[in-house]
């Protein structure tokens, strides 16, 4: 059991200073280097005299300097807000407006000019590292202090900043490194694929740093090259694969992704979206000896609240795979619409309680009050997911209560997509709906569009109109939120309350 994340890193800097903590295609950084670099960066950050415990936005990709900066900020007492290099400018602005960071650290070139907030460039971080300044930790992040803040999709088009404390992180990390389902070895060799702005990344970096392992990262140029990406992954000595099931499905398009070509790969950790029977079955065919662990949980409960090893028997007998045994320190309940606890086998909303539950959304008391509450004297969170518990305390997933979905590993609120589409000067009304496959997994996003008067006449074909609408909103939307198909209508169905009847459109798309 670890009691402090930085203490663990510092310990390995003493006992295995030359062991690699980070490897990007053979370019390695050691635990000794991570300590020296993070100490120097922390000293530099202290010299800026920022407001104590104020959050700092860090912009970049899957690089070592991002990791070193995160560690430095933790040492200097600041929560970090990871923002991926591929984020839309409008989203970055929204995050800045909500979070009010005291500083922006741009590991990659920052796409915006922000008044009133200082910006530190990569060259300044490099200069700080070269200074090799010693650092004495007197005010590092601890206890209920925010460790990181990750922004997720919001129902009003505004992202929500989930605050995860040091205590929250310890609850998750200690469970993961001690739980028999994960079976994390000492010095784990982990693939670092999900971006730091996606909390699934915590599932690889937290246990790796806690156990003195190595993170194998991929440069962003390689990630964009599908063929080269999976050829390269097959050559990495990774023992543990952490990703969404969708990314594994992509990997299985490559013949090199198999046990014969990747004998070191023994564990698969999945979270972020539903693991289907077909994906698990294909993985067992490719990696007959591998362990497949299915984890479940919202960002607000610190990455995951349950996990289970998927067996071949489960693949043969379940139509939807179980999502795990709840964490011992995080009692999980099923409640009805009145908040009453339901018995085993009864379906209702999944709620999670205990020390992994976030304190709420940053600077958003209204949304915090809606989602976070107290249950049986413990901090609790409404997941909005439908589920049930078996008599053996295995959690089963039954879908979403609302219109929030998981697609390609990302959590997306349909209203968020609709709001972004409605910003197009050509659109009068728009709504996004998911199309599901037979395994209840989101196959793609579609958009129903009513265009403004005179717009259709400007285009010879609907394809050209679709391209024009996409171009008009691409600077406001994350690419994974863009619907793959646009359906044009003269009007959209309404509920008796005068709202767009999304349920009817979902049923229409899915032939219900």
From Swiss-Prot:
Q: Which PROSITE patterns match?
A: AMP_BINDING
Q: Which Pfam families match?
A: AMP-binding, AMP-binding_C
Query: Recorded E.C. number(s)?
Result: 6.2.1.54
Hydrolase: present as a keyword of the record?
no
**Which residues participate in D-alanine binding?**
199, 303, 499
Q: Which GO terms describe its molecular function?
A: ATP binding; D-alanine [D-alanyl carrier protein] ligase activity
Q: Which UniProt keywords apply?
A: ATP-binding, Cytoplasm, Ligase, Nucleotide-binding
What reaction is this protein's catalytic activity? holo-[D-alanyl-carrier protein] + D-alanine + ATP = D-alanyl-[D-alanyl-carrier protein] + AMP + diphosphate
- Write out the GO biological process terms: lipoteichoic acid biosynthetic process
InterPro entries for this protein? AA_adenyl_dom (IPR010071), AMP-bd_C (IPR025110), AMP-bd_C_sf (IPR045851), AMP-binding_CS (IPR020845), AMP-dep_synth/lig_dom (IPR000873), ANL_N_sf (IPR042099), DltA (IPR010072), DltA-like (IPR044507)
For the keyword Ligase, the answer is: yes
Query: Which biological pathway?
Result: Cell wall biogenesis; lipoteichoic acid biosynthesis
GO terms under cellular component: cytoplasm
Question: Where is the protein situated, by its record's location annotation?
Answer: Cytoplasm
Function field: Catalyzes the first step in the D-alanylation of lipoteichoic acid (LTA), the activation of D-alanine and its transfer onto the D-alanyl carrier protein (Dcp) DltC. In an ATP-dependent two-step reaction, forms a high energy D-alanyl-AMP intermediate, followed by transfer of the D-alanyl residue as a thiol ester to the phosphopantheinyl prosthetic group of the Dcp. D-alanylation of LTA plays an important role in modulating the properties of the cell wall in Gram-positive bacteria, influencing the net charge of the cell wall.
Give the protein family.
Belongs to the ATP-dependent AMP-binding enzyme family. DltA subfamily.
**UniProt cross-references to PANTHER family, sorted A to Z:** ENZYME, PUTATIVE (JCVI)-RELATED (PTHR45398:SF1), PTHR45398
Q: What is this protein called?
A: D-alanine--D-alanyl carrier protein ligase
**Native source organism of the sequence:** Streptococcus pyogenes serotype M5 (strain Manfredo)
Q: Which gene encodes it?
A: dltA
